[in-house]
């Protein structure tokens, strides 16, 4: 990651030197646009477009605009690009503690992986899975857990009902759904209690919701729930590993997708949190910790809740302001435990487990090189509770839970690492922004609508694969086209 930061600062230094040379009347470097109509420097601007956020959405938008001739500056608050992707080195191997997976129906992800010369590996799913349903542990193969037959029937009918309803919610404008106000007036738990009427099934669905959204059904608008499921291809595709949204992961870590785009994205400043955006006539000025920059347009790609912490002048319209105030972020703690052996495989287990009470999910995260690893998510309300506890107490809970499912050998990992996304000051949570009842139907149209010269992107604004890395890339493509249609290219 240090090399990427060096490249970033070198590019920024080069841009400053180029501007200084022009101000002194020097010749433009070869390949630089000549001053003239459409050149931002004629009007004293630093760039055509400023992008706030150096994650997948921001860098995708920036490189698309740079490729069409726009001068672009990316301002990333953290010390490295990546957004909600984060790859760390543990025991000499690289692991993702942020966004990780891709799957069928994600063309932009696979195109970018190929473009950057990266590769993927399938998520390990051979062997039996574990379901900890309200304290009762069972193992099963395939998609169907070993539960009471009546519970299984209710669950299958419930999933069918959910998928049938989510297909009625438009991907582009869920607030235009004929039943939008009705569904946005209740929580996902309200609907489940009225329609599933089985505590075990409700517990299983809530367990899935915690993983997908990082929150509980009681906090989630049913309209938002349905829209997200429709965008992701339905309930089963969102929770499945094999042939689902968790089908494969990037060898060497997903953050490489962001670092690989840096050389294509114009000038990128890290350690530059944005504090204020001012619109003044035909320009915008953006105040960051790395200085103030001016441009014709600004694209904000940070999480919705984080965008609410930026000061805007003039203030945002009521619709946009009310939406951002209501958006929350999911709570997710991602934990890695490395071992000398894949002992769970030797016992015929896949490494996958779900607990409805503990709020945990596990996967086999063993590297292609053979470094044995178990990955655990602590999600939803349990994650918020554990975030407040001492680190050693949290570690003990994680290892006790792994022992509960995989045996005493899980108690002594060779390496242990956790990442609490709610504690990340420039992310605020994971995996996605969530909306309580009464938000999408009333304020949803402000989600993607530009505010003057301010444009919005980020995975939550995507039409397909909302909340996934694919959705972030889609939103970057969409906002780049939006800006290109309005800004004249030199």
What are these regions (language model features)?
Residues 170-273, 280-283, 301-305, 311, ...:
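Active-site/ligand-binding neighborhood in enzyme catalytic cores
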Residues 47-74:
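N-terminal Rossmann-like FAD-binding beta1-loop-alpha1 element of flavoenzymes
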């Amino acid at each position: 990651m240090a090399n990427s930061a060096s490249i970033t600062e070198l590019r920024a230094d080069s841009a400053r030197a180029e501007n200084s040379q022009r101000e002194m009347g020097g010749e433009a470097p070869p390949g630089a646009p000549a001053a003239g109509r459409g050149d931002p420097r004629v009007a004293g601007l630093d760039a055509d477009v400023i992008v706030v956020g150096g994650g997948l959405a921001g860098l995708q938008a920036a490189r698309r605009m740079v490729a069409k001739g726009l001068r672009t500056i990316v301002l990333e608050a953290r010390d490295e690009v990546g957004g909600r992707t984060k790859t760390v080195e543990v025991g000499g191997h690289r692991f993702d503690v942020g966004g990780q997976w891709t799957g069928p129906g994600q063309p932009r992800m696979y195109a970018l992986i190929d473009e950057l010369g990266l590769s993927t590996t399938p998520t390990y799913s051979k062997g039996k899975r574990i379901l900890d349903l309200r304290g009762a542990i069972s193992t099963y193969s395939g998609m169907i857990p070993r539960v009471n037959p009546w519970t299984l029937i209710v669950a299958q009918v419930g999933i069918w009902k959910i998928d049938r309803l989510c297909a009625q919610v438009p991907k582009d404008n869920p607030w235009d759904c004929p039943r939008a106000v009705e569904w946005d007036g209740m929580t996902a738990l309200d609907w489940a209690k009225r329609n599933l009427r089985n505590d075990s099934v409700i517990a299983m669905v809530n367990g899935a919701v915690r993983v997908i959204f990082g929150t509980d059904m009681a906090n989630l608008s049913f309209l938002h729930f349905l829209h997200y499921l429709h965008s992701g291809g339905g309930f089963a595709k969102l929770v499945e590993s094999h042939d689902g949204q968790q089908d494969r992961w990037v060898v060497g870590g997903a953050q490489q997708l962001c670092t690989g785009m840096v050389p294509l994205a114009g000038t990128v400043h890290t350690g530059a949190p944005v504090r204020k955006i001012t619109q003044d006539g035909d320009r915008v000025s953006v105040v960051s910790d790395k200085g103030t920059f001016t441009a014709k347009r600004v694209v904000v790609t940070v999480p919705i809740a984080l965008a609410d912490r930026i000061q805007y002048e003039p203030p945002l319209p009521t619709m946009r302001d009310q939406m951002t105030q209501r958006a929350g972020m999911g709570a997710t703690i991602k934990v890695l435990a490395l071992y000398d052996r894949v002992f769970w495989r030797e016992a015929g287990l896949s490494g996958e487990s779900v607990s409805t009470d503990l709020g945990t999910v596990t996967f086999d995260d063993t590297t292609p090189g053979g470094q044995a690893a178990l990955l655990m998510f602590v999600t939803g309300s349990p994650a918020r509770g554990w975030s407040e506890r001492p680190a050693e107490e949290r570690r003990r809970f994680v290892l006790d839970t792994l022992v509960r499912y995989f045996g005493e050998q899980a108690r002594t990992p060779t390496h242990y690492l956790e990442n609490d996304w709610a504690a990340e000051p420039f992310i605020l949570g994971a995996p996605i922004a969530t909306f309580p009842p009464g938000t999408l139907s009333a304020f949803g149209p402000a989600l993607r609508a530009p505010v003057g010269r301010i444009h919005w992107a980020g995975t939550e604004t995507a039409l397909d694969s909302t909340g996934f890395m694919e959705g972030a890339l889609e939103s970057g493509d969409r906002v780049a086209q939006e800006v290109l249609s309005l800004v004249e290219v030199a």
